[in-house]
């Protein structure tokens, strides 16, 4: 809901324009802007599909125009948008589920997930640079790149709700639900104040704000439907596996295959994640695999002399 409201208010377009202003003039600038824009959009959106639609509509045509093939342009956009789910503080619904699974605060999840998310985007940035070098591509023309200072200050109000969210999570240590709630309320009022100041007619400004808010609520509800159904279905699977004793038998089979070899066990976990990922969204996939494999990984690791923190195991499952 928070991401949908921010996107409806123009936050997604702002982050994309800011990305183009920052890296558009570099070699292969559109690809780097797509990666940076998707990463910043991932700050507010936990949906890879919404991220792809928001940024890809603008970045893919520009990447093709500057020399990238349509396949590479699509691959760069999709990979950077999918990685948006790894970017704190939102991280999709999986981060909230992970916090309840492990029994730690949401802040702990965000703290441990921040560096891997940055590393993933640095890797994408580097790969896009190598592709641009290989194709001998140049940056965008000065006339096509927005002014950085002007672009940054044009949407400064979009950063306020994000700072509210981070402040409440990090410094006040509020729960994720409370933090998101107050950040959403601040977003609604900040957008109202901005439109009231920007618009010439207060009545028209209020009408625009009201329409944006309603559309944001609708998009947020639609985004939650798919996630809710997937999590509910995954919960049924997890409950059935636990109640029938299949989990115990599965653990015995996996341990007999791995034979206390942690590397083999990690590889089997990756394969299971990838297979389930063909038909399940990220959150549902994480719920199923974490319920089956997280404890096994910790136990086998301890038996082999390795100490696997539970949060590291859950993040491993989440990433694959």
Residues of each region from the PLM?
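Core transmembrane alpha-helical segments of multi-pass membrane transporters/permeases
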Residues: 1-13, 207-246, 262, 266-279
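Hydrophobic transmembrane alpha-helices that form the pore/transport pathway of multi-pass ion
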Residues: 18-84, 282-320
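Hydrophobic alpha-helical transmembrane segments in multi-pass membrane proteins
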Residues: 29-30, 84-93, 120-125, 158, ...
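Hydrophobic alpha-helical transmembrane segments
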Residues: 31-33, 42, 100, 110, 159-160, 164-173, 181, 276-278, ...
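Residue-level recognition of pore/gate-forming positions within transmembrane alpha-helices
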Residues: 39, 81, 100, 116-117, ...
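Membrane-embedded alpha-helical segments of transport systems
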Residues: 41, 73-95, 111-127, 317-320
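Long, contiguous bundles of hydrophobic transmembrane helices that form the permeation core
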Residues: 111-223
């Amino acid at each position: 809901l928070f991401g949908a409201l921010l996107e409806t208010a123009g936050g997604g377009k702002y982050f994309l324009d800011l990305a183009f202003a920052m890296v558009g003039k570099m070699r292969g600038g559109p690809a780097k802007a797509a990666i940076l824009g998707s990463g910043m959009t991932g700050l507010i959106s936990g949906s890879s599909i919404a991220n792809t639609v928001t940024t890809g509509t603008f970045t893919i045509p520009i990447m093709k125009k500057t020399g990238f093939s349509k396949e590479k342009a699509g691959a760069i956009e999709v990979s950077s948008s999918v990685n948006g789910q790894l970017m704190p503080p939102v991280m999709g619904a999986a981060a909230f589920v992970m916090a309840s699974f492990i029994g730690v605060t949401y802040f702990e999840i965000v703290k441990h997930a921040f560096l891997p998310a940055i590393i993933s985007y640095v890797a994408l940035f580097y790969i896009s640079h190598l592709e641009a070098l290989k194709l001998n591509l140049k940056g965008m023309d000065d006339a096509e790149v927005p002014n950085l200072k002007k672009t940054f200050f044009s949407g400064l109000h979009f950063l306020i709700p994000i700072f509210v969210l981070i402040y409440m999570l990090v410094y006040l240590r509020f729960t994720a639900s409370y933090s998101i709630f107050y950040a959403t309320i601040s977003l609604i009022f900040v957008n109202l104040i901005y439109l009231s100041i920007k618009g010439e007619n207060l009545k028209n400004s209020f009408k625009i704000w009201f329409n944006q808010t309603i559309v944001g609520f609708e998009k947020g509800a639609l985004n939650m439907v798919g996630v809710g159904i997937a999590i509910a279905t995954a919960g049924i699977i997890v409950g059935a596996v636990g109640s029938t004793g299949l989990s115990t038998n599965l653990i015995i089979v996996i341990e007999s295959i791995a034979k206390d070899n942690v590397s083999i066990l990690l590889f089997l976990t990756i394969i299971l994640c990838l297979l389930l990922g063909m038909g399940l969204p990220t959150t549902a996939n994480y719920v199923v695999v974490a319920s089956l494999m997280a404890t096994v990984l910790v136990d086998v690791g301890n038996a082999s002399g390795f100490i696997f923190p539970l949060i590291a195991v859950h993040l491993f499952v989440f990433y694959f």
